[in-house]
Amino acid sequence: MALPNWFIDEMAHAGSEHLDPGHVSGYDHKSATDPTEDLDVLRKLGLNETHTLVDLGAGTGTFSLAAAPFCRSVIAVDVSPQMLTQLEHKREEEGIANVESVQGGFLSYTHEGEPVDFVYSRHALHHLPDFWKVVALDRIAAMLKSGGVLFLRDLVYSFEPAEIERIIESWLAGASKNPELGWTRKELETHVCEEYSTFSWLLEPMLQRCGFTITDTEHRGSIYSAYTCVKN
């Protein structure tokens, strides 16, 4: 799909580390993501082998590949070709046939075929400024069936303006000292300075305005949030 000239370039907002083959090769070890909790949530919401799931911002495919045995098909979408190359290596090694990798993003992925049952996104929406978050959420709603589920997990600030300095400093103080084992203070500072995490009290009205009912909300440590949303 040709995008209007006034659309932002998602590749420019992807984060340079996600386009760096060296970083991507160590991404799974650094992020240490366990998909079990989120997969359990979706299965309790009814995810089964008749369903199609779209994973937006799929990265190296940790969640997509874990979800594949429980779905008819998984569409793993990411703007980074380096991430998708890593995903494909893992898919081939694990012998998984029902995961399709697609280069694209929240604004550029065009879903073809029937509306899907589930959309999943983890730690990706924050790469977009708030205006474009709304565009992205509206596009997600358009690809979901009525009653379909969006499970969104991201860095979302669930605190009041007067608490900004205290909570951000506390978060930074807990950063990893080893860049191979976790996110360092410098990397977390870059997130705050250059990426677009928003407040929960801004994101939640966006979800509602884009046609979702928020059925469950979880906040962890004032920085991380998860939303279960059903398309109206």
PLM features: residue spans?
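Conserved class I S-adenosyl-L-methionine
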Residues: 2-59
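A short glycine-rich, Lys/Arg-flanked "PGG" loop and its adjoining helix->strand segment in the class I
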Residues: 134-146
